[in-house]
């Protein structure tokens, strides 16, 4: 009859085929789901400071500091095919030099076992909001939007943008205090 190695090979090949079919079924069962959730985002206490930037030709840069409040419930997103979320806050604006400027200000990894309902109040930006030049002062249209990557157990990585955006006009004068 068949020896032990050929039987083990057949068993392993069948097991891998079944696992591939289950993985494909897992992906297909969640591919058409809507992963957008309502968010409530407010941006407060925006200050712009002019700093020296030796990395640019102008040697001037605008540094913005701000606080924000975020309320979002991600529990609807976590189905059995979602492993974790990578959530981040982006500021978008136009300047004379660049048509699109996007700056990530804050991020967080949300896992299934973590708290999936975020109610953050008075959060400071985690990363510097630095513009190469003086384009932030008196800017009328800086848009803040929450985005998140849905990291699945199987399937493709989704980029989801919150439907709610906040447009904030920036101050008309520089702040002169040392602390924000």
From Swiss-Prot:
Lumenal side of membrane: 34-180
Annotated glycosylation sites: 141
Parts of the chain that traverse the membrane: 13-33
Localization terms from the record: Endoplasmic reticulum membrane
Any single Gene Ontology cellular-component annotation: signal peptidase complex
GO biological process per UniProt: IRE1-mediated unfolded protein response; protein targeting to ER; signal peptide processing
Family: Belongs to the SPCS3 family.
Species, as recorded: Caenorhabditis elegans
Keyword Transmembrane helix: yes
Cytoplasmic side: 1-12
UniProt name for this protein: Signal peptidase complex subunit 3
Keywords: Endoplasmic reticulum, Glycoprotein, Membrane, Signal-anchor, Transmembrane, Transmembrane helix
Membrane topology recorded in Swiss-Prot or TrEMBL: Single-pass type II membrane protein
Function: Essential component of the signal peptidase complex (SPC) which catalyzes the cleavage of N-terminal signal sequences from nascent proteins as they are translocated into the lumen of the endoplasmic reticulum. Essential for the SPC catalytic activity, possibly by stabilizing and positioning the active center of the complex close to the lumenal surface.
InterPro entries: SPC3 (IPR007653)
Domain of life: Eukaryota
Subunit structure: Component of the signal peptidase complex (SPC) composed of a catalytic subunit sec-11 and three accessory subunits spcs-1, spcs-2 and spcs-3. The complex induces a local thinning of the ER membrane which is used to measure the length of the signal peptide (SP) h-region of protein substrates. This ensures the selectivity of the complex towards h-regions shorter than 18-20 amino acids.
Pfam families per record: SPC22
Gene name, Swiss-Prot/TrEMBL: spcs-3
């Amino acid at each position: 009859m068949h020896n032990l190695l050929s039987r083990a090979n057949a068993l392993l090949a069948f097991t891998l085929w079944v696992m591939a079919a289950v993985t494909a079924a897992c992906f297909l069962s969640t591919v058409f789901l809507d992963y957008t959730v309502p968010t409530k985002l407010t941006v407060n206490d925006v200050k712009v400071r002019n700093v020296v930037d030796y990395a640019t030709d102008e040697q001037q840069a605008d540094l913005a500091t701000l606080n924000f409040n975020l309320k979002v419930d991600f529990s609807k997103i976590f189905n059995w095919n979602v492993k974790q979320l990578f959530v981040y806050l982006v500021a978008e604006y136009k300047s004379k030099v660049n048509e699109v400027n996007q700056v990530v200000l804050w991020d967080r990894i949300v896992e299934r076992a973590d708290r999936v309902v975020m109610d953050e109040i008075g959060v400071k930006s985690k990363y510097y909001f630095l513009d190469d030049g003086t384009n932030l002062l008196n800017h009328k249209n800086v848009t803040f939007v929450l985005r998140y990557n849905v990291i699945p157990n199987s399937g493709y990585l989704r980029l989801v943008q919150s439907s709610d955006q906040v447009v904030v006009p920036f101050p008309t004068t520089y702040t002169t205090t040392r602390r924000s």
